[in-house]
Amino acid sequence: MLILSRKVNEGIVIDDNIHIKVISIDRGSVRLGFEAPESTLILRAELKEAIVSENQKASASVDESLLENIKKVIKP
């Protein structure tokens, strides 16, 4: 992991097209601004983890009887 120190209004550039700027530092909280192409997905880590968790729950809760009914309808 690369660790950098930045002050307010200083920034970091990633891959020439992603710019991160320190907007403010207040009471243990840092506000960051991001400039990136619209195709770049930027998420807070906890939101990404929640999405992954929900996707895993959704894929694990397949009703086996429903699958059997689908197999009966779709015969090779």
Curated annotation (Swiss-Prot):
Compartments where located: Cytoplasm
Keyword annotations from UniProtKB, A to Z: Bacterial flagellum biogenesis, Cytoplasm, Repressor, RNA-binding, Translation regulation
GO molecular function: mRNA 5'-UTR binding
One Gene Ontology cellular component annotation held by this UniProt entry: cytosol
InterPro entries (UniProt xref): CsrA, CsrA_sf
Gene Ontology terms describing biological process: bacterial-type flagellum organization; mRNA catabolic process; negative regulation of translational initiation; regulation of bacterial-type flagellum assembly; regulation of carbohydrate metabolic process
Entry annotated with the keyword Lipid metabolism: no
NCBIfam families, alphabetized: csrA, PRK00568.1
Family as reported in the entry's similarity comment: Belongs to the CsrA/RsmA family.
Binding partners and assembly: Homodimer; the beta-strands of each monomer intercalate to form a hydrophobic core, while the alpha-helices form wings that extend away from the core.
Task performed by this protein: A translational regulator that binds mRNA to regulate translation initiation and/or mRNA stability. Usually binds in the 5'-UTR at or near the Shine-Dalgarno sequence preventing ribosome-binding, thus repressing translation. Its main target seems to be the major flagellin gene, while its function is anatagonized by FliW.
Listed PANTHER family: CARBON STORAGE REGULATOR (PTHR34984:SF1)
UniProt-recorded name of the protein: Translational regulator CsrA
Organism from which the protein derives: Helicobacter pylori (strain Shi470)
